[in-house]
Amino acid sequence: VTGADKLAIKSTAAVRFVDSEGDGNLDMAFVTTPIYGTVNTYNADRNDFSTTAKLNNRNITSSRNAANFENFTFEDDLVKDDVIAINIDVTSGEILYTVSLVEPVVGELTRVTANDKTITVGGTAYGFYEGEFNGTAPEAKVDNYGSGDLGKELTLYTDGKYIFQATDGTSGKLGTNFAF
């Protein structure tokens, strides 16, 4: 299984089960994880969409090509630097992309728990995503936050449970496992 370490407990990606023979038995199971990144360009009138998100080490783009652009479904209006999730569907035999905005979570940092690698913002505890953001490992880590950050308002981008992009902390730790 390729990339299983990234799905084990650091993703909320759903598992799809397929009965391709129609006999009531599962023939296949697969996981499609979203790809996260930011918008470089978006202009539907020009069939133009490009992003920092990568698939097989290549930026996902329509290349201003109408046929390529038809493979994208946009759930939201986009502007440069929006944080997005791209879900890929290959069940039709073609690579189809669904692009949606990732809404930020804004709240006060009230707890840093280094042992569990979590922070609590707005009353919810979040771990840190271990997949890719903008084609590289996310820079958001529990080590970025310390006691000097408690009470600070943070902006997080999450998959609902794991942070892949966040406001930087001061990294001025004086120890671990702080609460405010």
Question: What are these language model-derived features?
Answer:
Residues 1-180:
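...the same signal can extend to comparable exposed beta-sheet modules
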